[in-house]
């Protein structure tokens, strides 16, 4: 579907953005999250300049995203290593099973 204009409130300001209908709930949740972050920053930093608060919030979000990417990359690397170990274990078990079968076949000949 095509994007529809949606009005959201960010830090007391109205903003109209285009958004596909199926993503409007996610957009609204993101707006709520951003508002909460901005309010929290305003209290913690005592910065009153909205533009500065927005930049600080953007930097914080970028930092969090970078941290999550690192976690995901580490997790994927760990899973790849475990999969390789499992493959080696399975291959070794199959080789041993093949040797056992060969010995049993040789005994019956």
Swiss-Prot record:
Keywords annotated in UniProt: Cell cycle, Cell division, Coiled coil, Cytoplasm, Septation
Coiled-coil region(s): 71-99
GO cellular component: cell division site; cell septum; cytosol; plasma membrane
GO BP term, example: septin ring assembly
Pfam families: ZapA
Protein's cellular compartments: Cytoplasm
Keyword Cell division: yes
Subunit structure, interactors included: Homodimer. Interacts with FtsZ.
Similarity-based family: Belongs to the ZapA family. Type 1 subfamily.
Annotated function: Activator of cell division through the inhibition of FtsZ GTPase activity, therefore promoting FtsZ assembly into bundles of protofilaments necessary for the formation of the division Z ring. It is recruited early at mid-cell but it is not essential for cell division.
Protein name, per record: Cell division protein ZapA
Species: Serratia proteamaculans (strain 568)
Upper lineage: Bacteria, Pseudomonadati, Pseudomonadota, Gammaproteobacteria, Enterobacterales
Gene symbol of the encoding locus: zapA
């Amino acid at each position: 579907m095509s994007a529809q204009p949606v009005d959201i409130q960010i830090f007391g300001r109205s903003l109209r953005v285009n958004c596909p209908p199926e993503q409007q709930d996610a957009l609204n949740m993101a707006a709520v999250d951003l508002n909460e972050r901005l309010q929290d920053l305003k209290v913690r930093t005592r910065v009153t300049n909205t533009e500065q608060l927005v930049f600080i919030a953007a930097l914080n979000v970028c930092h969090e995203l970078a941290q999550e990417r690192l976690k995901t990359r580490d997790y994927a690397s760990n899973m790849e290593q475990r999969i390789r170990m499992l493959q080696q274990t399975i291959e070794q078990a199959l080789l041993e099973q093949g040797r056992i079968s060969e010995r049993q076949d040789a005994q019956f000949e």
